[in-house]
């Protein structure tokens, strides 16, 4: 079946240094509370427990140089530089060695968060 009930977003493609082809971004996996200084900055208890994981939609990704409008209804649109790893092979419960071998490349990513919304929802015990 190829028909869909609504139009699907295009898969974002990012340029790759010294390559004529781009890297398609199908999924974005993120790691939270893996940086103690940032956890302290956010006002949460700094512990050494395992970090937590979450996803972001590649449909919301923009390439470098694109202007991102300040979202209405927020007072604190926060930015963070992130290390981005691009995988060249699928992984599931991989060893550290297999995970390293699956890395296609790396780059920089700018994460934008509506921090006031995040803090308000955290106070309500919401993710």
Residue spans of the language-model regions?
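Catalytic-core "active-site belt" of small-molecule-metabolizing enzymes
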Residues: 1-127
């Amino acid at each position: 079946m190829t028909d869909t009930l609504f139009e699907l977003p295009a898969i974002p493609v990012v340029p790759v240094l010294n390559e004529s082809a781009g890297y398609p971004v199908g999924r974005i996996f993120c790691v939270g509370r893996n940086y103690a200084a940032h956890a302290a900055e956010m006002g949460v208890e700094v512990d050494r427990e395992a970090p937590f994981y979450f996803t972001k939609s590649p449909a919301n990704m923009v390439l470098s140089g694109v202007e991102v409008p300040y979202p209405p209804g927020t007072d604190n649109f926060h930015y963070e530089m992130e290390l981005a790893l691009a995988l060249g092979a699928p992984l599931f419960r991989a060893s550290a060695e297999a995970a390293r071998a699956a890395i296609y490349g790396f780059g920089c990513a700018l994460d934008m968060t509506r921090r006031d919304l995040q803090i308000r929802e955290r106070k309500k015990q919401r993710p």
